[in-house]
Amino acid sequence: MNSYFTNPSLSCHLASGQEVLPNVALNSTAYDPVRHFSTYGAAVAQNRIYSSPFYTPQDNVVFGSSRGPYEYGSNAFYQDKDMLTSCRQNSMGHNTQSSLAQDFSSEQNRGNGQEQKGSIQIYPWMQRMNSHSGVGYGTDRRRGRQIYSRYQTLELEKEFHFNRYLTRRRRIEIANALCLTERQIKIWFQNRRMKWKKESNLSSTLPGGTGAAADSLAEGKEEKQEDSEGQGKE
């Protein structure tokens, strides 16, 4: 059986073998008598005290392939465990940073879209567009023009041909017959009278058009009479 103390290749071989060991006194507390290599035997192996647990080669592969077999101990185990935990934390931190970057980019795009919507200039014609349907951009909510059917227009023209001014009772009757409101009937007759006045003024400018002036005077008297009658009934 060869050993470091019986190998002739060693230049520092001595008979006692104590000089190979560190230069420490035998009675020193730092010197471990169990690790004295001059004696061998089963009794010494049984009484030998290990300061660190024994690890199998499998543990060496799992927890640290870069470590030598002499570097393993309780501290090495905890260091490997800390390295695994730090790697997991770094990967989780990287994923969190990527998700935060995506959220920030989506919020930035959303903010840019809102700024573009807010920077659109609204013109007056855009405010009046589709205001009767409540889809206009501005606060100017104006009523749209009432579109009358051909039947309604024909009946109103017949009534205007006989009576240019209507009493309130007659307005209610026509409104019920034509499925219109009293206000719509009143507005239609006002617009129709304005149109009739324009036509009469054009005819009065022509020679022999004195009758139009008399008709306009009579119209003014009838309009005043209609207004006074409507106020008295209301």
UniProtKB/Swiss-Prot annotation:
Among the record's GO biological process terms, what is one? anterior/posterior pattern specification
Give the primary localization class: nucleus
Residue segments, region Disordered: 88-116, 199-234
Which InterPro entries does this UniProt record tie to the protein?
A: Antp_homeobox, HD, HD_metazoa, Homeobox_Antennapedia_CS, Homeobox_CS, Homeodomain-like_sf
Composition bias, kind Acidic residues: at what positions? 225-234
- Identify the Pfam families for this entry: Homeodomain
A GO CC term assigned to this protein in UniProt: nucleus
Keywords annotated in UniProt: Developmental protein, DNA-binding, Homeobox, Nucleus, Transcription, Transcription regulation
DNA-binding region, residues? 141-200
Where in or outside the cell it occurs: the entry states: Nucleus
What's the stated role of this polypeptide?
A: Sequence-specific transcription factor which is part of a developmental regulatory system that provides cells with specific positional identities on the anterior-posterior axis.
| Family according to the record | Belongs to the Antp homeobox family.
Tell me the protein's name: Homeobox protein Hox-C6
Q: Which organism is it from?
A: Xenopus laevis
